[in-house]
Amino acid sequence: MNLNDITFLLSVHGLDQLPEDGLPEFAFAGRSNVGKSSLMNTLLRRSGFVKVSGRPGKTQGLNFFQAAEDCMLVDLPGYGFARVSKEMQNNWQKLITSYISEREALKCVVVIIDIRHEPKALDRQLLDWLREQKVPVLPIYTKIDKLSGNQLSRHAAILDAGHGIKKDERILFSSKTGQGRDELIAVLESYLA
């Protein structure tokens, strides 16, 4: 997978705008402010390429990034943020739900969860729904550099239990240190083989 040659392709606000090139797609989902953009920038080794915002709700469409001729990375709007209108939240939910359930090019949804917080109902609902839809899912616990070793193990175990995740089914990730990047690339590449 060539992540050195990455370009922003387009922002999609309706299913009729989806690219039709047939490249494999990997979607990145997570609650607002869990470190989704930072994770994507670390993955690409390009600081600031995917816009990072301290303001939740910044991503408002499905943002497609093309990695050479290999695949697409799709940045989904963050969920669970209350400062946008209910109508906007509903529109995002419909768009994301339709995209995930209908898109044949979608190979895996990377679900990003902040390890510092207790299990959230919205994360569990998304994980359960993806499993029901038979969509491959890769949970990633971010911001691991913010916890000590003992805290990290305890928080990971709590999230695993709360979300029905086995230890070998998820990745611990730090955008600050890059830990987990190689594991993430290996999993994504396994879908391209």
Swiss-Prot record:
Signal peptide: none
Sequence positions that bind GTP: 30-37, 57-61, 75-78, 142-145, 173-175
EngB-type G domain boundaries: 22-193
Disulfide bonds: none
Keyword Transcription regulation attributed: no
GO annotation terms (biological process): division septum assembly
The protein's required cofactors: Mg(2+)
Record-linked InterPro entries: G_ENGB_dom, GTP-bd, GTP-bd_ribosome_bio_YsxC, P-loop_NTPase
GO molecular function: GTP binding; metal ion binding
Any Gene Ontology CC annotation: cytosol
Positions that bind Mg(2+): S37, T59
Presence of keyword Endoplasmic reticulum: no
CDD domains linked to this entry: YihA_EngB
Keywords: Cell cycle, Cell division, GTP-binding, Magnesium, Metal-binding, Nucleotide-binding, Septation
Pfam family membership, one: MMR_HSR1
Similarity comment text for this entry: Belongs to the TRAFAC class TrmE-Era-EngA-EngB-Septin-like GTPase superfamily. EngB GTPase family.
NCBIfam families in alphabetical order: GTPase_YsxC
Function (record text): Necessary for normal cell division and for the maintenance of normal septation.
Name of the featured protein: Probable GTP-binding protein EngB
Organism of origin: Desulfotalea psychrophila (strain LSv54 / DSM 12343)
